[in-house]
Amino acid sequence: MLLQLREAIGKQKMLIVSPECVTVYQGVPDYSADTPGQAYNYFVNVIRLADQAIDLYQPQAYNNWYDVPGGTVNYLKDVYLNWRNYKGIMDWMKPIENFEGVAGRKLMMGVLASTSAGGAAYYYQPSVLQEFISWLSENKYELNGFMIWDSHWDSLNGNAISNIATQ
């Protein structure tokens, strides 16, 4: 379906996938795309089949369960490493077999603009977001950018998140 959509819209338009509450997670089985009730890893097969058609992925770095607390730099690192299919921060994790991961140039991390924009436990203080950006730079990891949910809450929060994300 995504390949046909790409063909129909051509290369002049971008195809951006923003999976809500869907995650790539090395700690669970690799489900098929039609397995009902599975938010974890069913998207791996979508990526395998249609990555060449997709310009950007914007996974939420919130509202998804990982083995580290939300709102922390380790949560951001874990989301990033899992979507890239690099070894996660948990010692027992292993990359998903036969899966290249999402290229950093295609990955945008979805973050909350304030505690009011979603689950407060998943809000990243500007200092945490800055620490994550520094970690990316230190490790020479590529990231296309951030998707901030949403601009209304960011404005009410003094543009704290967009100011950090655009540095």
Give each language-model segment a name:
Residues 1-167:
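Secreted glycan hydrolases and related glycan-binding modules that recognize and/or cleave
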